[in-house]
Amino acid sequence: MSDLSHIRNFSIIAHIDHGKSTLADRFIQMCGGLSDREMEAQVLDSMDLERERGITIKAHSVTLHYKAQDGKTYQLNFIDTPGHVDFTYEVSRSLAACEGALLVVDAGQGVEAQSVANCYTAIEQGLEVMPVLNKMDLPQAEPERVKEEIESIIGIDATDAVACSAKSGMGVLEVLERLVTVIPAPEGEIEAPLQALIIDSWFDNYLGVVSLVRVKNGRVKKGDKILVKSTGKVHQVDSVGVFTPKHTETADLKAGEVGFIIAGIKDIHGAPVGDTLTLNNTPDVEVLPGFKRVKPQVYAGLFPVSSDDFEDFRDALQKLTLNDSSLQYEPESSEALGFGFRCGFLGMLHMEIIQERLEREYDLDLITTAPTVVFEIVQKNGEIIYVDNPSKLPDLASIQEMREPICRATILVPKDHLGNVITLCIEKRGVQRDMHFLSGQVQVIYDLPMNEVVLDFFDRLKSTSRGYASLDYSFDRFEPSNLVRLDVLINGEKVDALALIVHRDNAPYKGRQLVEKMKELIPRQMFDVAIQAAIGGQIIARSTVKALRKNVLAKCYGGDVSRKRKLLEKQKAGKKRMKQVGSVEIPQEAFLAVLKVDS
């Protein structure tokens, strides 16, 4: 296909559970990408984790050939995108490789906040957005209401939105037919020098770095020498090809196409995502606009349970960072937990997924400390520093002002649940900025402290609205706030990994709850264990795990009271000595207890 008019590059924008992976499965079936024997549900979600949780985490690409009713055969390059708020950067990368996007909306539930945010990203990048109403076979489908919502919330014309049901296959052909007419063909010159954008890369132990690319201009084939623009290094191409979704080698990749390039790059940072590839003999080709780097919003310490695993842990993180460019990490040491890494994540789900991937794919046992956000600290000498670890907070005497990150949150919620959602936002110290009543739903915009949002806000929002509310948030600014560091002392010793930065008003309550929670989780020892919560030098809460005690009087039958007293005194002295030298084992659950404290 030397002519680009046959190519259509598109991705699907949809909220979690609105059926985009199922729709992708139908496309693959109809275009004969896989035989019936190889077909399985959620065929693009290749990670076990994605299947179990029913969410898409990574962007995947598939090239399909579709014979349309006008007699032409089109090459469809479809890039799957995640729908969860934590993986927005994956979406913007996928969209950079497309000319159009399908906005898939559940005809029963209507528009969700996350789809709105991704849809705006697509429109900003100049993509043609085509609305599709899915799950039309369900009795609760209300196509007219949902069309109205798409028009009033997102502002795109939805009068001729295609209605389909990905599960039953109804209307999927109409979606494909509309797609080839609505979405424009890519622009590009096959004869021009090579320009290819790296959308994604991952590390294969046998092949080295595998890069998923969108070719803008030119062509690339096996044996070509390619230049990575950011590193200036030259590599020889071992193979190029496409996913159908099987790994299929082709003779070359041309302008407008999406496929993979393997060039035997062994250095993990050899082909960064968002970089431009060109041929060695045309090194002065312009760099394509990449993606903006996303800043992590949540930081947590990850430590291997056994210190022997530290090197393996570092290798695993390096390989994972290649595949997930938003993960950041730096070495950290803790008195309580030894050596590990301070990692930055986009949100709590991202953190859970990374931890699970490390444990599953790389067979590591890890302990995670409580996540925190980044605080801006203005010191008395005028210097501004950023702190992502409570134990690194400078002495309070040297701090002029502490500022916490505020995010702008957009919440879409049905009218019936509006009261509960507003109560939750007020409890989380939110300030209402705006409210729009739409047909059936209300859009509320709040400024909320990031600290309150990242921990459990998403879960609480879902439970107070019975799962109907949806949330999208983005960092807005830093704002001065009355913050303090809450330390946890066990037997008079501070445990650095348990420190938290909290708002002063919430501190006594948080401290009490944390201490009670720790009391349940720390196993009883042979001596009393005192658990205290402190702000600076002031203890604000205390609890004691009572000692186990052996009945030393069991062998005295009757007898003199002084004999009994002697045995009890001896036991007491032994316990006192033990308390001075004994150390308390803190289980992993205790570190996570910090999360479970309802603020």
Curated annotation (Swiss-Prot):
Which UniProt keywords are given for this protein, alphabetically ordered?
Cell inner membrane, Cell membrane, GTP-binding, Hydrolase, Membrane, Nucleotide-binding, Protein biosynthesis
Gene Ontology terms: cellular component: plasma membrane
**What EC class is this?**
hydrolase
Q: Which residues form the tr-type G domain?
A: 5-187
Which InterPro entries does the protein's record reference? EF-4, EFG_III/V, EFG_V-like, EFTu-like_2, LepA_C_sf, LepA_CTD, LepA_IV, P-loop_NTPase
| Biological process annotations from GO | positive regulation of translation
Name the major location. Answer: membrane
Pfam families tied to this protein? EFG_C, GTP_EFTU, GTP_EFTU_D2, LepA_C
Instruction: Write out the catalysed reaction.
Output: GTP + H2O = GDP + phosphate + H(+)
Q: Name one GO molecular function term.
A: GTP binding
Q: Where found in the cell?
A: Cell inner membrane
Q: Output the PANTHER family linked to this UniProt entry.
A: TRANSLATION FACTOR GUF1 HOMOLOG, CHLOROPLASTIC (PTHR43512:SF4), TRANSLATION FACTOR GUF1-RELATED (PTHR43512)
Name of the featured protein: Elongation factor 4
User: What species was this sequence derived from?
Assistant: Pseudomonas paraeruginosa (strain DSM 24068 / PA7) (Pseudomonas aeruginosa (strain PA7))
